[in-house]
UniProtKB/Swiss-Prot annotation:
<keyword id="KW-0460">Magnesium</keyword>
<keyword id="KW-0808">Transferase</keyword>
<dbReference type="GO" id="GO:0032263">
    <property type="term" value="P:GMP salvage"/>
</dbReference>
<dbReference type="GO" id="GO:0032265">
    <property type="term" value="P:XMP salvage"/>
</dbReference>
<feature type="binding site">
    <location>
        <position position="92"/>
    </location>
    <ligand>
        <name>guanine</name>
    </ligand>
</feature>
<feature type="binding site">
    <location>
        <position position="135"/>
    </location>
    <ligand>
        <name>guanine</name>
    </ligand>
</feature>
<keyword id="KW-0479">Metal-binding</keyword>
<dbReference type="GO" id="GO:0005886">
    <property type="term" value="C:plasma membrane"/>
</dbReference>
<feature type="binding site">
    <location>
        <begin position="37"/>
        <end position="38"/>
    </location>
    <ligand>
        <name>5-phospho-alpha-D-ribose 1-diphosphate</name>
    </ligand>
</feature>
<dbReference type="GO" id="GO:0000287">
    <property type="term" value="F:magnesium ion binding"/>
</dbReference>
<comment type="pathway">
    <text>Purine metabolism; GMP biosynthesis via salvage pathway; GMP from guanine: step 1/1.</text>
</comment>
<keyword id="KW-0997">Cell inner membrane</keyword>
<keyword id="KW-0660">Purine salvage</keyword>
<keyword id="KW-0328">Glycosyltransferase</keyword>
<dbReference type="GO" id="GO:0004422">
    <property type="term" value="F:hypoxanthine phosphoribosyltransferase activity"/>
</dbReference>
<comment type="similarity">
    <text>Belongs to the purine/pyrimidine phosphoribosyltransferase family. XGPT subfamily.</text>
</comment>
<feature type="binding site">
    <location>
        <position position="92"/>
    </location>
    <ligand>
        <name>xanthine</name>
    </ligand>
</feature>
Amino acid sequence: MSEKYVVTWDMLQIHARKLASRLMPSEQWKGIIAVSRGGLVPGALLARELGIRHVDTVCISSYDHDNQRELKVLKRAEGDGEGFIVIDDLVDTGGTAVAIREMYPKAHFVTIFAKPAGRPLVDDYVIDIPQNTWIEQPWDMGVVFVPPISGR
């Protein structure tokens, strides 16, 4: 990836609230299925904003830090997804999205970020990201002291 897009906690919350507003009325949803790990934090934010208490996970491994690898389903939520929102942080090349669509064909699949290759596979997303861009999520970064430029 040649570019990086840094996401802050407040940006993520703003984007999640925007997505939640598009998913109203919340009564139409039975629950949320968060794709682990990227969808866990956005899933919690959606659950809060929509007042949804039924939250489950589908655990899929497809990245090793910044390298994409073979998809492996570690745990899945039951059912075909009817009445559920499936949330992930990002749709990239579409590998995970294809697996999600096969497991939950009746779910409403949403992400915060979408790259061009995966965009057609989700029902809704908030932010367009160029395909060659790596997203730095706030949960992957630490807060560090940065000394003043003057050095004083």
